[in-house]
From Swiss-Prot, chain A:
Protein name as annotated: Urease accessory protein UreF
Subunit structure: UreD, UreF and UreG form a complex that acts as a GTP-hydrolysis-dependent molecular chaperone, activating the urease apoprotein by helping to assemble the nickel containing metallocenter of UreC. The UreE protein probably delivers the nickel.
Origin organism lineage: Bacteria, Pseudomonadati, Pseudomonadota, Alphaproteobacteria, Rhodobacterales
Superkingdom of origin organism: Bacteria
InterPro entries (UniProt xref): UreF (IPR002639), UreF_sf (IPR038277)
Entry similarity comment: Belongs to the UreF family.
Subcellular compartments: Cytoplasm
Chief location bin: cytoplasm
HAMAP family for the chain: UreF
Taxonomic source organism: Paracoccus denitrificans (strain Pd 1222)
A GO CC term assigned to this protein in UniProt: cytoplasm
Protein's UniProt keywords contain DNA repair: no
Keywords: Chaperone, Cytoplasm, Nickel insertion
Functional description taken from the UniProt entry: Required for maturation of urease via the functional incorporation of the urease nickel metallocenter.
From Swiss-Prot, chain B:
GO molecular function, one term: nickel cation binding
Organism of provenance: Paracoccus denitrificans (strain Pd 1222)
Name the record gives this protein: Urease accessory protein UreD
Entry keywords, A to Z: Chaperone, Cytoplasm, Nickel insertion
Subcellular location(s) per record: Cytoplasm
């Protein structure tokens, strides 16, 4: 493959992880919609929900999966099995696989290299492993994109202004960087979570009668 | 010589004084006509009560009466092709304060082709300062399935105990025909404890249980399971990713959790409950 400068790699990464990159990310909320609907997450407590997601939940697990998928010699088929096996509910599985599959199809169209369907962090890691950028930078940007998608869901659901949402994202950045740095050197034994409340929310979202989001 | 100690409700709140680390290993192999091999050493025992009806039952017991720093417990079950069994534990497993190395539990559960294992252990009770690493590895042959329960209680609410320090890693990995199909790992440490009351974490719950049923018909049990998720004092939910039914339960205390688990087990399995799970 052709070599790419770090500056060009940064542009490519920002493109892949932009909300405009067509992966359908706007349609999912990881159960946040149910938690907001129940009043368990409000404008005041959303930052706390996001921190738990990042340090002890799906955000952390995605970061570790991405880190493993970025490594030289990574077995992406095996990591994809792992990513799917880790999803505790049907909608979370659909969320990560449908976005990852769309991501892989986009990358295949752009690069001319075929990419099989995979869970999102595995598809991103497989596509970005060749970029001459530190793993922590790629993971940090991925986590920020995921957090931004959750905040965007909250802006559409709650009384929460878009600028206030962006302020929440800015407030989360030190924690995003810290989690990205930890994930950069993590191993498969670090794939563990403690966010059962968020898992319950994602499961219960499946039985919501009226909903905006697919998860 | 191993450090044995008294156990039972009277002694639950008392930190054990243990001079030596305990080791235990118990291994059972069952075939369609019954027991094929049984090996046990140290503090681990495996009992096979004579059954008059239903599936054969395996009951594990840790005679050390709990787990402290550096203790290690290995349980192993091997079911031959077309063999069905139920395995459980004689008592709740207690993890006490551990100053140095965490206690370790390793479970290796193998189910042969067309076989079935119900792994329905009693609660794991974690005391303040407990350090425990548990790894449950399940290997299913093609056409095999299992039901896995894992109830965990944080301290004893009835005794007013609160947990200030904890290190728990509890990982369950199921492979079928060598391919990973289920991975569920819970990690609780001091950093997580400080946030435990958050709604994304455990909320007010101090008892929790996961249930995973791995079988082609798992999705058929989703609605029946959801229909009984209404035990007072328990918040639960279920979902069925392909080939799996997964339940998470959060409860105020161990008793409502146990009542909810029993009601779910009656829906999820055709056979009578093991004696230990009857109330």
């Amino acid at each position: 493959m052709t070599t790419i400068t770090p500056e060009a790699a940064r542009l490519r990464l920002a493109q892949y992880l932009s909300p405009a990159f067509p992966t359908g990310g706007f349609a999912w909320s990881q159960g946040l919609e149910w938690a907001m609907d129940q009043g368990a997450v409000t404008r005041a407590t959303l930052p706390q929900w996001l921190e738990d997601w990042l340090d002890h939940g799906a955000g952390w697990c995605d970061a570790v999966l991405l880190s493993l998928a970025l490594r030289r010699g990574a077995d992406h088929a095996e990591l994809d099995d792992l990513a799917r096996a880790m999803c505790p509910c049907a909608r979370r599985l659909a969320e990560t696989v449908e976005q990852g599959t769309a991501f892989a199809a986009n990358v295949a169209a752009l690069t001319g290299r075929p990419q099989s369907a995979a869970a999102l962090p595995v598809a991103v890691g497989r596509a970005c492993g060749c970029l001459p950028l530190p793993a922590g930078e790629i993971i940090g940007l991925y986590l920020q994109a995921q957090a931004a998608a959750l905040i965007s869901a909250a802006v559409r659901f709650l009384p929460l202004g878009p600028v206030e949402g962006q302020a929440m994202l800015a407030g989360l950045q030190p924690a995003l960087l810290a989690a990205a740095a930890r994930a950069g050197t993590a191993d498969p034994k670090d794939l563990a979570s403690a966010t059962w409340g968020a898992d319950l929310a994602a499961m219960r979202h499946e039985t919501m009668v009226t909903r905006i989001f697919r998860s | 010589m191993r450090g044995r100690r008294l156990s039972g409700p009277m002694f639950d709140a008392i930190a054990p004084i243990r001079m030596q680390r305990s080791r235990g290993a118990a291994s059972v192999r069952l075939g369609p006509r019954g027991i094929e091999d049984l090996a046990q050493s140290g503090s681990a025992k495996a009992m096979l009560p004579r059954m008059t009806a239903g599936r054969p039952e395996i009951v594990f017991l840790n005679t050390a009466g709990g787990l402290a720093s550096g203790d290690r417990l290995d349980y192993r079950i091997e079911l031959a092709p077309r063999t069905q069994a139920l395995a459980t534990t004689q008592t709740a497993e207690r993890a006490y304060r551990a100053k140095d190395a965490p206690a370790q539990i390793r479970l290796h559960l193998q189910v042969g082709e067309g076989g079935w294992l119900d792994w329905l252990p009693q609660e794991t009770i974690l005391y303040d300062g407990a350090r425990l690493g548990r790894e449950t590895a399940v290997d299913l042959a093609p056409g095999a399935g299992c039901l896995l329960l894992e109830p965990i209680i944080l301290g004893r609410l009835a005794m007013g105990e609160t947990i200030r320090h904890l290190q728990l890693t509890d990982r369950r990995i199921v492979r079928q025909d060598g391919r990973m199909i289920h991975h569920d790992a819970l990690a609780l440490d001091d950093a997580a404890l400080s946030r435990l009351h958050h709604p994304a974490m455990l909320g007010k719950a101090r008892a929790m249980a996961s249930l995973a049923l791995i079988a082609p018909h798992a999705a058929d049990l989703l609605e029946p399971a959801r229909a009984v998720l209404d035990e007072p004092g328990v918040t639960g939910a279920a979902s069925a990713p392909p080939g799996r039914l997964i339940l998470r339960l959060l409860a105020d205390d161990g008793w409502p959790l146990r009542r909810q688990v029993i009601r779910l087990l009656r829906v999820l399995r055709p056979d009578p409950l093991p004696r230990i799970w009857q109330v």
